[in-house]
Amino acid sequence: GDEHQNFAGELRRWDGGGDPVAVEFVATSISSGGSGQDKRANADRIMARNPELKFSNDQRGYLVCDVAPDLWQTHFRVVDKVHEPGGQLSTRATLSVERGKAAIVS
C-alpha cells in the first residue's frame, strides 16, 4: 500500500482470534508531499475500531530499528515539516518487542 503514515500493530490470525502471531511496523516516506500532522482527523476512531493497532502517526520520517538477541526496538523518527528547508527531526515513539513474544511491549 501507499499510506504515507506510520503504524505499529499486532497481527492476528485471519479470524481475529487468539494471541498475536506477529508484529508489524510500517513507515511513511520522509520526502513525500505534505508535512503531515501528528494524527489524522479520524485517527482516534480508527484506533478505537482496530485494537490491534498500537501506534499511528501522520508525519513524514523513517524508522530506526535496534535489534539485539532479546529485544527489538523500533524508533519512529519524524520531521515537523518537509515543504521547506529546516525541518526538525525527533523521535515520535519507540516501541519494543521481546524475544519469543509476538506483541508490542512498550
Spans of model-derived segments:
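Long, structured stretches of catalytic cores involved in phosphate-ester chemistry, encompassing
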Residues: 1-106
